[in-house]
Amino acid sequence: MKTIKQRISYAVMGLITMGFTACTQNEDMAPTLKGQEINATFSVGGMQTRVNTLGDGKNWEDKDKLKVSIFTDSDPGSTTVLSFNGETWSRSGSFRWLNGYEQHTILAVYPSDTDFGKNNLQYDLQTDQSSEGNLKNADLITGYWYDAPRFDLSIPMKHRMSLVTIVYHVGTADYPNMDISEPQVYSKHNSVDFSRDDRQGQFVMSTPTANPAWVQACKHDDGMFSAIVIPGSYKTGEIFLKFKIGDKNFHAKMRSNTEFQEGHRYTYKLDVGKDKVKLTQISVDDLKGWDSNNEEDLK
């Protein structure tokens, strides 16, 4: 009988980890690990999904899932799903070494319905992010490991997209009792390919070459909207936002050259008046999540 263990360590690294062990493992086991349950730690505790990031982050949500694939060059392998119920993680399906000698690839992906696997490493941006659910599902977090089978391994997770948050103000004298509608954010690309750099043990994003896309943003809180875009370069004067007030169309341009990076949030202030539309960058934040320095907030 196999067991599933969840280890929670705030004091050491602030990680929520899922370890999978076999009851039959002991010091007298055969040298080969073929068929043995994999004892893996996924560092998801320092990560947060983007809907949580709209607030203060610091937690995964009920029904969040990670899809984990394991394969080799000669074996298509198998897939399991890690599910969170608001308190603990569990898994479905087998998670075992395919053989005891070949280099294995383990690829963990959020959201779990992302069609990543051995034969498909292309990410297509979801352009309708007008609801919080759609915004969350447009996120992309990956974990990658490549090596020969071993008893214990750690798989770090990494945000791959860029988050744009707009804090806006509409002049009440110019537009009384009116609000922004149909906000859109410009993504320089609508898809991107990834590749396995096995020599360096990295899962890397190639330079995107796909067509640009307008992303329907999610309005949230009071006077804010957000969207996830594929990292890319923006030039001064390039139209970055589109929106409406009443039946009138507006756009806002970048005021400086900006390079969006993986796993960062770019926050802007948008001021709209009768004769002005001004976009000003407020901050750039690294969305690695939290660490052990504030574990008291997580308990």
Label every model-predicted segment.
Residues 2-10, 19-299:
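Sec-type signal peptide cleavage vicinity
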